[in-house]
From Swiss-Prot:
Organism lineage string: Eukaryota, Fungi, Dikarya, Ascomycota, Saccharomycotina
Gene name per UniProt: RVB2
Record's protein name: RuvB-like helicase 2
EC number: 3.6.4.12
Organism: Kluyveromyces lactis (strain ATCC 8585 / CBS 2359 / DSM 70799 / NBRC 1267 / NRRL Y-1140 / WM37) (Yeast)
BP term (GO), one: DNA repair
Function: DNA helicase which participates in several chromatin remodeling complexes, including the SWR1 and the INO80 complexes. The SWR1 complex mediates the ATP-dependent exchange of histone H2A for the H2A variant HZT1 leading to transcriptional regulation of selected genes by chromatin remodeling. The INO80 complex remodels chromatin by shifting nucleosomes and is involved in DNA repair. Also involved in pre-rRNA processing.
The protein's assembly and partners: May form heterododecamers with RVB1. Component of the SWR1 chromatin remodeling complex, the INO80 chromatin remodeling complex, and of the R2TP complex.
InterPro entries referenced in this protein's UniProt entry, alphabetically: AAA+_ATPase, P-loop_NTPase, RuvB-like, RuvB-like_C, RuvBL1/2_DNA/RNA_bd_dom, TIP49_P-loop
Family membership noted in the UniProt record: Belongs to the RuvB family.
Pfam assignment, any one: TIP49_C
């Protein structure tokens, strides 16, 4: 009996999801904060981007906080893209928190608690700490293991270009060296306070020890001077993270689970007092960040009242709000106001307006999106998508790119042609054609009273119910 085996190979694709604003890497400004026509994924909206550049400078200076900025404009005019560009330009050191207006309505947290947490996530604290480090090249590691499996003992010989020292090793340090796979010739750094071992690389003097090296092997110079050095380390945390850690016995676990719950105001007051002391002593530096609230018209009057008060607080970020509403009711009231915001909050805000894109800007954006999604469009297909975007919306035409690609792949083509876009246009309705369809067949839909006419035509045969 013969047993046949068959080899099967499967290619695993990496997870590379493309979001709506993944092509944006900044605001596209030059050194003088003047916007370029098309740069860093941003196209058009020159006046709005110039205004966002001023806000960017305010945040980077760090001297101004507690300001409200409202970005108002019609749908599909790049309001969220403007905020994403601002967050990319700020970098990792400045906290940036983005939420939607509907996120704060939860059964677990009150509205004010959810807003407070969002505000405090947007305030960073740079805590300076002086630590003693031992940096040098490992000459030799001797580890003596007991036959009975008891405590391990060992010696570590470490050197710089100027000196060499032998350290006695305890059980914890031996485990750390084993975990980091430290060998003779490695350049390491040991934190004396915590015992943390960091592998910096391999010494240039040992570069010829092996014929083959891994791709992640890094060669560094042997450290100079003293073995023990003092180094200032800066830790950046948000106020919310400090709140969570101090709110319960094992609060640091809540940072990973997300189960923060309501945090008492007394805890926050104590933290504010302590942070103020650190600031006076020069141990900490406050970094006002940015809180971006999209669809801000979804908030109600109580939330707007809270934001008014929170903006006056000592620890307040710059709040950027976005809305596409015109004259509409403020949620929770019967009063109409511009953009659906109360007049007192509008009075505190500086307002940036966005305008509809023209055909050339839509074409540029669609070109950037097709490059980001790795879709090859023919010039005629790009022109057709531009016309569709001008007549319907930019979102609809950009959504058709990936759909048209699937249709093109169905006919074994790598390039999206006009017929692929036309087929996608016929298969998927835009909002205007959808409204027209609903109006035409309104009688066949369930209305707001729960009634529907299920008969297709007046002259159709109906069931006889007169018996």
């Amino acid at each position: 009996m013969s047993i046949q085996t068959q080899d099967s190979q499967e290619t695993l694709k990496s997870l590379s999801l493309i979001a709506a604003h993944s092509h944006i890497s900044g605001l596209g400004l030059d050194e003088n904060l003047q916007p370029k026509p098309s740069s860093q994924g941003m196209v058009g909206q020159l006046q709005a981007r110039r205004a966002a550049g001023v806000i960017l400078k305010m945040v980077q200076n760090g001297s101004i906080a507690g300001r409200a900025v409202l970005v108002a404009g019609p749908p599909s005019t790049g309001k969220t893209a403007l905020a994403m560009g601002l967050s990319q330009s700020l970098g990792k050191d400045v906290p940036f928190t983005a939420i939607a207006g509907s996120e704060i309505f939860s059964l677990e947290l009150s509205k004010t608690e959810a807003l407070t947490q969002a505000f405090r996530k947007s305030i960073g604290i740079k805590i300076k700490e002086e630590t003693e480090l031992i940096e040098g090249e490992v000459v030799e590691i001797q580890i003596d293991r007991s036959i009975t499996g008891g405590h391990k003992q060992g010696k570590l010989t470490i050197k710089t270009t100027d000196m060499e020292t032998i350290y006695e090793l305890g059980n914890k340090m031996i485990e750390g060296l084993t975990k980091e796979k430290v060998l003779a010739g490695d350049v390491i750094s040991i934190d004396k306070a915590s015992g943390k071992i960091t592998k910096l690389g391999r010494s240039f003097a040992r570069s010829r020890d092996y014929d083959a090296m891994g791709a992640d092997t890094k060669f560094v110079q042997c450290p100079e001077g003293e073995l023990q050095k003092r180094k200032t380390v800066v830790h950046t945390v948000s106020l919310h993270e400090i709140d969570v850690i101090n709110s319960r016995t094992q609060g640091f676990l809540a940072l990973f689970t997300g189960d923060t719950g309501e945090i008492r105001s007394e805890v926050r007051d104590q933290i504010n007092t302590k942070v103020a002391e650190w600031k006076e002593e020069g141990k900490a530096e406050i970094v006002p960040g940015v809180l971006f609230i999209d669809e801000v018209h979804m908030l109600d009057i109580e939330c707007f009242s809270f934001i008014n008060r929170a903006l006056e607080d000592e620890f307040a970020p710059i709040v950027i709000m976005a809305t596409n509403r015109g004259i509409s009711k403020t949620r929770g009231t019967n009063y109409k106001s511009p953009h659906g915001l109360p007049l007192d909050l509008l009075d505190r805000s500086i307002i940036i307006t966005t305008k509809n894109y023209d055909a050339s800007e839509i074409k540029t954006i669609l070109t950037i999106r097709s490059t980001e999604e790795e879709v090859e469009l023919s010039p005629e297909a790009l022109d057709l998508l531009t016309n569709i975007g001008s007549e319907t919306s930019l979102r609809y035409s950009s959504n058709l790119i990936s759909v048209s690609q699937q249709i093109a792949q169905k006919r074994k083509s790598n390039t999206v042609e006009v017929k692929d876009v036309e087929r996608a246009y016929l298969l998927f309705l835009d909002s205007a054609r959808s409204v027209k369809f609903v109006q035409e067949f309104e009688s066949q839909y369930i209305d707001d009273k729960g009634q529907v006419n299920i008969s297709i035509g007046k002259d159709e045969d109906a069931m006889d119910t007169t018996a």
